[in-house]
C-alpha cells in the first residue's frame, strides 16, 4: 500500500543520509 511505499522511501532516504555522514567522518 501507500504507507508501505512511504516507509520504504523513508528507509532508503535515512540509509542514504547515514552513508553520506559516514563518508564524511
From Swiss-Prot:
Q: Mind telling me what this protein is named?
A: Ocellatin-L2
Q: Name one GO biological process term.
A: innate immune response
Q: Does the keyword Secreted apply?
A: yes
Q: In which tissues is it expressed?
A: Expressed by the skin glands.
Q: Which family does it belong to?
A: Belongs to the frog skin active peptide (FSAP) family. Ocellatin subfamily.
Subcellular localization is given as: Secreted
Question: Keyword Secreted: yes or no?
Answer: yes
Any single GO CC term annotated in Swiss-Prot or TrEMBL for this entry: extracellular region
Q: Which UniProt keywords apply?
A: Amidation, Amphibian defense peptide, Immunity, Innate immunity, Secreted
Describe the task this protein carries out.
Shows a low activity in stimulating insulin release from rat BRIN-BD11 beta cells, and acts without loss of integrity of the plasma membrane. Does not show antibacterial (E.coli and S.aureus). Does not show hemolytic activity against human erythrocytes.
| Classification via Pfam families | Antimicrobial15
Q: Mainly localized where?
A: secreted
In-chain residues carrying the UniProt-annotated modification Leucine amide: 25
Amino acid at each position: 500500500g501507500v504507507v508501505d511505499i512511504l516507509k520504504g522511501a523513508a528507509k532508503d532516504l535515512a540509509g542514504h543520509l547515514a552513508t553520506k555522514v559516514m563518508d564524511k567522518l
